[in-house]
């Protein structure tokens, strides 16, 4: 059976693994998921990620990050634009997550980026997810 929303599946796996304090989480790899993982790494939400080749599409192994007393770094993660209801934001309507404490991941014409970079470059796009 095919998966209707692979990005939501990735975000749910991260949310669930973080809630039970797993060190790593495996998700099926794709270019879009690699871009999202790279944003999470650059913004300090995960420690790192590896792409494991398995002869098919590959596996993306994310190393989750926790504080000194094992408190979660990712406290919330939410899918915004879904296959049944796409959500777009113009360049002057890009949302702020928790007043700038979180990030919005946006798919723009210049690639997948954060809300801060999209605002700086003056581009809008599809709002994929909020992470805080």
From Swiss-Prot:
<dbReference type="InterPro" id="IPR035987">
    <property type="entry name" value="Ribosomal_uS8_sf"/>
</dbReference>
<dbReference type="GO" id="GO:1990904">
    <property type="term" value="C:ribonucleoprotein complex"/>
</dbReference>
<dbReference type="GO" id="GO:0006412">
    <property type="term" value="P:translation"/>
</dbReference>
<comment type="subunit">
    <text>Part of the 30S ribosomal subunit. Contacts proteins S5 and S12.</text>
</comment>
<keyword id="KW-0699">rRNA-binding</keyword>
<keyword id="KW-0689">Ribosomal protein</keyword>
<dbReference type="GO" id="GO:0005840">
    <property type="term" value="C:ribosome"/>
</dbReference>
<keyword id="KW-0687">Ribonucleoprotein</keyword>
<dbReference type="GO" id="GO:0019843">
    <property type="term" value="F:rRNA binding"/>
</dbReference>
<comment type="similarity">
    <text>Belongs to the universal ribosomal protein uS8 family.</text>
</comment>
<dbReference type="InterPro" id="IPR000630">
    <property type="entry name" value="Ribosomal_uS8"/>
</dbReference>
<dbReference type="GO" id="GO:0003735">
    <property type="term" value="F:structural constituent of ribosome"/>
</dbReference>
<keyword id="KW-0694">RNA-binding</keyword>
<comment type="function">
    <text>One of the primary rRNA binding proteins, it binds directly to 16S rRNA central domain where it helps coordinate assembly of the platform of the 30S subunit.</text>
</comment>
<dbReference type="Pfam" id="PF00410">
    <property type="entry name" value="Ribosomal_S8"/>
</dbReference>
<protein>
    <recommendedName>
        <fullName>Small ribosomal subunit protein uS8</fullName>
    </recommendedName>
</protein>
